[in-house]
Design a protein with these regions (language model features):
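Hydrophobic core of transmembrane alpha-helices in multi-pass small-molecule transporters
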Residues: 20, 101-117, 229, 309-323
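C-terminal ends and interior cores of transmembrane alpha-helices
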Residues: 84-98, 293-305
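Helix-to-loop junctions at the C-terminal end of transmembrane segments
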Residues: 62-75, 270-282
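C-terminal transmembrane helical hairpin of 12-TM major facilitator-type secondary transporters
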Residues: 263-266, 270-323
Length: 323
C-alpha cells in the first residue's frame, strides 16, 4: 500500500479533487435546490423531473462522443475545458433567469461537465496510469466523490440554510476558480507520464484501446449493461426526489444533512471493500455485488418511516455507492 501511494501521489490528488468538484453536477447536490427551482419556475415535481431527465439524457448522448477527446488531447487541456464548463454552469445557476430553455441549458451543463465529463476524467485517469493498481486508484478518485457527498449537503443544509440559492451557487463558482490552478500542479510532468503509459500499451493487454464498434459487437457488453445502469438509474431517482420523500416521511432537512455524513462514511467503507476486491477478483466477478445494498436500502425506504430507519437507509445507500 505504501508503494501505491508513493508511485504518483500528485495524480492521486488530481483524481480525488476533480471527482470531488464534479459533485456540483451530481443529482445529490442539485436536488437540494429542487423546491427552490420548482417554485422559481412554477413547475411541479413531474415537470421539473422531465426537464432534468431530458437534460441528463442529452448530456449522456453528447458525452459518448466528447469523452473520446481524453484519448487524443493533453489531459491538462481536457481537464481545463471540463472544469471551466462546470464553472460556467455554476455561474449560470447563480444568475438564474425565469426561462425554461435557460434552465434546460444550465441543468445540461451541470450534468454534462460535472456528473459526466469531470467524473469521467478522474476515473479514466486513475484506470489508465496505475496499471494493476487501478482498483485502488479508482477508489481514491471515488473517495473524492464520497467526500463531496459527505460534506457538501451537510454544509449546505446546516450552515447555509438561510442563504439564497443563487448566492450558494456563487460560492460554488468561487471554489471552482480556486481549484483550477491545482489541476496544473497535480498534472505536472503529464507528458512524461503519458509517454510511459504509451510504452506500456504493447505489454499490457488490459490497456488495449478499443473502438466503440468493438465494444458494441462484444456480447459481454450486453451482459454487463443492465448491471451498469441499474444502480445509477435507481439512485438518481431516489436522490432527485429526496426532498419530497423526506418531507412525506416527516424527516427534516437537517436530518438529511446529518444522514449524508453517515452515507459518506459507509461509502468509504464500501470503497475499502470494493477496490481490493476488483484488484483481486476483477470486475466480472464483483459486478453483481453492487446491487445487494441498493436493494436493501429501497426495501427499508419503502417499509419504514421511523427516523432510525432513515440512518439505516443512508448507510445501505452509502455502501452501495462505495462498492
Amino acid at each position: 500500500m505504501k508503494n501505491f501511494f508513493s508511485y504518483d501521489p500528485k495524480l492521486l490528488v488530481y483524481g480525488f479533487l476533480i471527482v470531488f468538484f464534479a459533485s456540483y453536477g451530481q443529482t445529490f447536490f442539485i436536488s437540494l435546490f429542487n423546491t427552490e427551482i420548482r417554485f422559481y419556475y412554477g413547475l411541479t415535481d413531474g415537470e421539473f423531473g422531465f426537464v432534468y431527465a431530458i437534460s441528463t439524457l442529452f448530456s449522456s448522448f453528447i458525452l459518448i462522443s466528447f469523452a473520446k477527446l481524453i484519448d487524443h488531447i493533453d489531459l491538462r487541456t481536457y481537464s481545463l475545458i471540463v472544469t471551466v464548463g462546470l464553472l460556467l454552469a455554476c455561474i449560470g445557476m447563480a444568475l438564474l433567469i425565469n426561462n425554461i430553455f435557460y434552465l434546460f441549458i444550465i441543468i445540461f451543463m451541470l450534468r454534462f461537465f460535472g456528473q459526466g465529463a469531470m467524473t469521467h476524467a478522474g476515473e479514466t485517469t486513475m484506470a489508465r496510469y496505475f496499471g494493476s493498481n487501478r482498483g485502488k486508484a479508482l477508489s481514491v478518485a471515488t473517495l473524492g466523490g464520497m467526500a463531496g457527498v459527505m460534506f457538501l449537503p451537510y454544509i449546505s443544509l446546516n450552515y447555509f440554510i438561510n442563504i439564497e440559492m443563487k448566492q450558494l451557487w456563487f460560492y460554488a463558482s468561487i471554489s471552482i476558480i480556486v481549484f483550477i490552478p491545482f489541476i496544473f500542479l497535480a498534472l505536472s510532468g503529464q507528458k512524461a507520464r503519458h509517454n510511459k503509459f504509451d510504452q506500456g500499451l504493447i505489454n499490457d493487454p488490459l490497456n488495449l484501446k478499443l473502438r466503440t464498434r468493438d465494444i458494441i459487437k462484444d456480447k459481454k457488453f450486453y451482459i454487463y449493461l443492465p448491471l451498469s445502469i441499474a444502480a445509477p438509474f435507481i439512485s438518481t431517482g431516489l436522490m432527485f426526489h429526496q426532498i419530497y420523500i423526506f418531507s412525506h416521511k416527516g424527516w427534516s432537512l437537517e436530518m438529511l444533512g446529518n444522514g449524508y455524513i453517515l452515507l459518506g462514511f459507509f461509502s468509504i467503507v464500501g470503497l475499502l471493500i470494493g477496490g481490493p476486491l476488483i484488484d483481486k477478483f476483477h470486475t466480472k466477478k464483483t459486478a453483481i455485488t453492487v446491487l445487494g445494498p441498493l436493494l436493501l436500502s429501497v426495501i427499508v425506504l419503502l417499509l419504514f418511516d421511523s427516523v432510525f430507519f432513515l440512518f439505516i437507509y443512508m448507510s445501505l445507500y452509502g455502501l452501495n455507492m462505495g462498492i
